[in-house]
Amino acid sequence: MSDDEHHFEASESGASKTYPQSAGNIRKGGHIVIKNRPCKVVEVSTSKTGKHGHAKCHFVAIDIFTAKKLEDIVPSSHNCDVPHVNRVDYQLIDITEDGFVSLLTDSGGTKDDLKLPTDDGLTAQMRLGFDEGKDIVVSVMSSMGEEQICAVKEVGGGK
């Protein structure tokens, strides 16, 4: 046996955070990566083929985590990165004093690594429902290694 300690870096599953899609096939309501941020497309316009080549797609999109507006122009025949976006519901168990939430997973475990949302309205809705003893379910959106609470709803009756 060796007395050496081994330290292994945490690794991810190896799954890609994005997948390629032709710019001409991305539609309003879809997702796209602009400036390395996952975004929801709110407007797409296409210019005609000019004398110097390809038709171009002009995308106007909103960052799904920061709500900032981003724009990009891409030749319609080129591929764009499209983020994998997942949305999962969890039941709220606790809100800590330092602004973290404790959530119940489907498998019965807890998820304790999320902060309260940056949206003050959502945070107020969560705190009010929690303080009143109501059953609160939060939707967590995840994409490209980021996670954020994006919706809150009350289920069933209170205690």
UniProtKB/Swiss-Prot annotation:
Residues 1-25 are annotated as: Disordered. One of its GO terms (molecular function) is translation elongation factor activity. Gene3D superfamilies: 2.30.30.30, Nucleic acid-binding proteins. The modification Hypusine is found at residue 51. Induction: Constitutively expressed. Up-regulated at post-transcriptional level by wounding and pathogen infection. Keywords: Cytoplasm, Hypusine, Initiation factor, Nucleus, Phosphoprotein, Protein biosynthesis. NCBIfam families: eIF_5A. This is Eukaryotic translation initiation factor 5A-2.
